[in-house]
Amino acid sequence: MGAGLPFAVGVKAATPEAQVICLHGDGSFGQNAMELDTAVRHKLPLLCIISVNGGWTADPERNMPGRDLGYTRYDKMAEALGCYAEYVEEPEGIRPALQRAWKKVEEGMVGFVNVKTDYRARATTVRFSSRKT
């Protein structure tokens, strides 16, 4: 968990001509978020998209202890590191934000889109939130 951005940076470094897009959840992104700095310093333009649902896994009833992460503004951190960054709160803002970010990637920047998502949303094929450890 949390290996998406390091892998994306590695792919871009190994194949500079590749179009690299990394999609992360907020919890896993937090584990290796500073790899954005690596991408910026080494001029590895890629697009990183974060689904910020405020916690580990989906919890429709909000009753799982230790799940809450809050809605971290990773876009502000990304911008401070030199990325082009946007924060999106409404579904209709996603496509335009991705288009603007991808344009910046094509210009040689690291693009970053932090998308606030519903904490109740989850995949229906795999229910990680119902797994017990």
Residue ranges of model-derived segments:
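Thiamine diphosphate
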Residues: 1-133
